[in-house]
Regions:
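Active-site neighborhood of HAD-like aspartate-dependent phosphohydrolases
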Residues: 1-35
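Alpha-helix N-cap and loop-to-helix initiation/capping positions
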Residues: 13-17, 50-57, 91-92
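Substrate-recognition element of Asp-dependent hydrolases with the DxDx(T/V) motif
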Residues: 22, 26-59, 72-85, 124
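Conserved hydrophobic residues forming the short capping helix/wall of the S-adenosyl-L-methionine
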Residues: 62-67, 101
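Short helix-capping segments at alpha-helix termini
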Residues: 66-72, 105, 146
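Conserved Lys-Pro-Asp/Glu-containing loop-to-beta segment of HAD-superfamily phosphomonoesterases
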Residues: 88-121
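Acidic, Mg2+-coordinating phosphoryl-transfer loop and its flanking beta/alpha structural elements
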Residues: 113-152
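Short acidic-hydrophobic, aromatic-tinged amphipathic segments that line or gate anion-handling sites
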Residues: 151-159
Length: 166
């Protein structure tokens, strides 16, 4: 929902390409006083497709791009585990969201958690956050599945920012 995704994984900084309007949306929200944090499953680390250093470089590109637009990127929390490792942080489990809540010393009750997959929405529900589906990225496929009650649906991250900023 921030960058183009691939079933073959995004393995290099050169492959990390933002979706149209996503970086501007994050910067607009940030400039308006919103904290934008990211919770992301990164099983490509466990699979050996890329290194932590490469992932951190991708995250730095995200931070730099948002900063160039006058915004600030908040915490980027990621799960490095594979789907069969039994960790507590891989979405749909709430571990990544709990890390974000602890970092900001806040409750996530009612906080908007925006994602493009069912596991994103399930993680939101697990911490009593507001599940928000964007149809960009893998969201169109997700929209066809049964969604958690009260899921809000928007075209993309820009539409979410437009709604929140009124």
């Amino acid at each position: 929902m921030i960058n183009y995704d691939s079933d073959a994984y995004i393995k290099t900084v050169a492959e990390w390409i933002p979706l149209p309007g996503a970086l501007d949306a994050i910067a607009r929200l940030s400039r308006a006083g919103w904290t934008v944090a990211v919770a992301t499953n990164q099983s490509g680390l466990a699979r050996g497709y890329y290194s932590v250093a490469t992932l951190e470089s991708m995250h730095q590109v995200l931070r730099d791009e948002v900063q160039q637009r006058g915004g600030a990127m908040g915490l980027i929390s990621y799960c490095p585990h594979g789907p069969d490792e039994g960790c507590a942080c891989r979405k749909p489990l709430p571990g990544l969201l709990t890390q974000i809540a602890e970092h900001y010393q806040t409750s996530l009750d009612g906080v908007w958690f925006v994602g493009d997959s069912l596991r994103d929405l399930q993680a939101a529900v697990a911490v009593n956050a507001q599940p928000v589906l964007v149809c960009s990225g893998k969201g169109e496929q997700t929209r066809e599945k049964p969604l958690p009650d009260n899921t809000l649906i928007f075209a993309d991250l820009s539409a979410v920012a437009d709604h929140l900023l009124g």
